[in-house]
Amino acid sequence: SQQGHHVTTKADATADRDGCVQWRLRDLQPGTRYQYEIEFAGQPLVQGDDYFFETAGSNKSSTTVRLAFGSCAREDKGSSAVWRQVRAVDPHAVVLLGDTPYIDSVDLAVQRRRHAEFAAVPDFRKLLRNRSLYATWDDHDFGRNDTDGNLEGKERSRRAFIEYRSNPSYGDGRSGIYTKFR
């Protein structure tokens, strides 16, 4: 942090989570900017001035919060232009409301591949480098067009979603993906 606080955590990328990791940091100060770097085998993978995050202010503080909402995005030039525009307005967090990405399958391998392809879009990655991401799903990333909660295989879609989206919580722990901020 700017005050010199140093926090270290470790996460293992394993095949059963498709190589996805989530870092859970503790004892962070409210309203504080933290620089970060990611290392593998002692070598930096990610580092630099643009790799930081800011914690939310305390519950007692009064501040303006800028949220960007989006949905129905693809890995194309049009969506990349939108990610650049969103980054330019400098939101504190991004909330994706579904169809990000379009998957239209409940096959776990397809789900994982599509989430990985979507996450690899350079402008999307740059946007999220220093912002929180919260997400829910809609029909195309849950299963197929116009499907509902009765879709067979939805547990595989939920598994891939949890692997690739680091929400604070996911439903009741067994089903659903809803979350809350505080």
Predicted regions: what is each one?
Residues 1-73, 88-90:
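Acidic, histidine-bearing metal-coordination/catalytic regions of metal-dependent phosphoesterases
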